[in-house]
Amino acid sequence: MEKVILGKTGLEVSKNGFGALPIQRISKADAVYLLQKAFYNGINYFDTARAYTDSEEKIGAAFEYTRDKIIISTKTAAQTGEDMWKDLEESLRTMKTDYIDIYQFHNPAFCPKPGDESGLYDAALEAKKQGKIRHIGITNHRIAVAKEAIESGLYETLQFPFSYLAADADLEIVEETKKAGMGFIAMKGLSGGLIHNSAAAYAYMAQPQFDHVAPIWGVQRENELDEFLSYQECPPRLDDALMQVIDEDRKQLSGDFCRGCGYCMPCPAGIEINNCARMSLMLRRAPQSGWLSEEWQEKMKKIENCLHCGQCMKKCPYGLNTPELLAKNYEDYKTFLK
């Protein structure tokens, strides 16, 4: 399998990384099966988070006896050093390990630094000295925080959304991490489900200028895993046909659109923002029947109860006018019900 070296960490990871957020939705037995199948077929990098409910526990069950042969990254959303220690100890316990390869701050609104009020970086540094974590990383959806993390020189890896829908500012982040010797871990390679052609997504990431990029693909079903494993044997190339797919997607998905990251949640009015705010796209890019069910009609109707409190706008890492986006999607949705 093609490998990627994560910058100054020196860690050599499979170009296909296993994103373990979706396995929280399946049984422990099914998750262990998928994880072990991935490992025995050449995938050695698994990414999870303390916030992903039982994902860490399932990783621990799958790799208790092969821990030294895999690379694990996990995340803490803690706001203080004290809480970071609690998260770290719990992650170590649930994954049945005494160290984490890459320990990441999970989408913080600021860039943790030594001596700041949060105490997060100081705690991570101490954990590294104790051997409980080997490398300190950060994940983010915000351009400004990502840039600050790169410029600080404090972080060994950056996990950031990246796909062929990336804007110029996103591409600049990718280039800057390479110059800084940081490992770049690409999340949202399928843009939260809006990209349907995984071959095009994979081929785009496989270009020479992205040789330092390690994409992680969220896997929940065996056929999804098989799809990415097949690219190891027969890597898709960025030919005219795949470029046409990319060009069409870029035309349809340019501008302001919801990536479905969910950082706006929860909504005080009970609106499922991360799906409702991109309903127009989902209706046109996926089978419509599921989105037009009575259940989804009720969920979309909740948009009428929007409080216009502005909480979602403040939380949105992409600076979207979320209430306006919800209203537009709702009006469009109603046209499909006539």
Tell what function each PLM region has.
Residues M1-I70:
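N-terminal binding-site loop/beta-alpha segment at the start of enzyme catalytic domains
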Residues K3, L35, E56, G60, ...:
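Generic structural signal for well-ordered alpha-helices
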Residues L6, F18, F46, I59, ...:
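Conserved, mostly hydrophobic/aromatic
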Residues G19, A49, Y103-H106, T139, ...:
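Conserved residues at the C-terminal ends of beta-strands
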Residues A29, Q79-I185, L190-G193:
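Glycine/proline-rich, positively charged
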Residues F39, I43-N44, E172-A186, L190-K338:
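Structured C-terminal cap/extension of enzyme domains
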Residues N44-A49, S73-T74, R134-G137, T157-F160, ...:
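Short catalytic-loop micro-motif centered on adjacent basic/acidic residues
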Residues K69-I72, Y155-S163, P235-L242:
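Short hydrophobic/aromatic-enriched beta-strand-loop microsegments
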